[in-house]
């Protein structure tokens, strides 16, 4: 697959602005023309080698950090993607954190508190396997988590979700202004997810 074809394919699945973007308008199973398993493997190997060199520069300069956020449903391939893509980097410069259900200490603080604690230092790459987006996804589906957070009743309601999204956007903008590049990777299709789960069960 030629580089320009890959760039065009990536442009179709890359979101640079949330304005007028809806996941339902994009087929997560779409495969770019000319992409085969062999070309994908070759591109992955090239990308891993390039990432390794970029990581060395990132570490040596010590001014920027990179935060890769993987947020998707179970069986979406987050673990496998992290394992394969990061296989060629120096593990001393990478921290992977998987966010599980919040514990008592985390519930006693604001919802971004546990995220702040895991941010990568300058010169390093941080990877979040699940993230602060859990607070507008899982918490919405499991109100008992929200109840356990002890938020004053006057702050609850529909406005809470809008406020949290604003807080997340502000948090990520702040990180960018402090020299932390935030890269976000979301979603696979439900059909792909069902297929992956059926292979395990």
Locations of regions flagged by a protein language model:
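Charged, amphipathic alpha-helical linker segments immediately N-terminal to NTP-binding catalytic cores
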Residues: 1-48
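Conserved nucleotide-sensing/catalytic segment adjacent to the nucleotide-binding pocket
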Residues: 34-43, 92-160
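Pre-Walker A adenine-sensing motif
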Residues: 50-59
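Loop/turn-to-beta-strand initiation segments
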Residues: 64-65, 123-125, 179-183
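Extended hydrophobic secondary-structure segments that form protein cores and membrane-embedded regions
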Residues: 67-72, 184-187
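Glycine-rich phosphate-binding P-loop
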Residues: 69-86
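ATP-hydrolysis module of ASCE/P-loop NTPase motor domains
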Residues: 149-177
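Conserved small/polar residues in nucleotide/adenosyl-binding loops
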Residues: 191-201
């Amino acid at each position: 697959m030629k580089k320009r074809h890959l760039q065009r394919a990536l442009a179709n699945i890359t979101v640079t602005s949330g304005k007028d973007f809806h996941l339902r308008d994009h087929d997560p199973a779409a495969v770019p023309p000319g992409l085969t398993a062999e070309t994908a493997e070759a591109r992955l190997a090239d990308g891993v080698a390039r990432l390794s060199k970029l990581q060395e520069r990132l570490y040596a300069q010590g001014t920027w950090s990179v935060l890769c956020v993987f947020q998707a449903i179970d069986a979406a391939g987050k673990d496998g993607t992290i394992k394969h893509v990061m296989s060629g980097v120096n593990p001393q410069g990478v921290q992977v954190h998987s966010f599980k259900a919040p514990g008592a200490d985390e519930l006693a603080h604001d919802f971004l508190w546990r995220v702040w604690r895991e941010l990568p230092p300058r010169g390093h790459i941080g990877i979040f396997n699940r993230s602060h987006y859990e607070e507008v996804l899982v918490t919405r589906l499991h109100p008992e988590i929200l109840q356990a957070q002890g938020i004053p009743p006057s702050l609850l309601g529909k406005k809470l979700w809008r406020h949290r999204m604003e807080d997340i956007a502000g948090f990520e903008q702040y990180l960018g202004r402090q020299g932390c590049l935030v890269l976000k990777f979301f979603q696979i299709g439900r059909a792909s997810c069902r297929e992956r789960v059926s292979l395990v069960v």
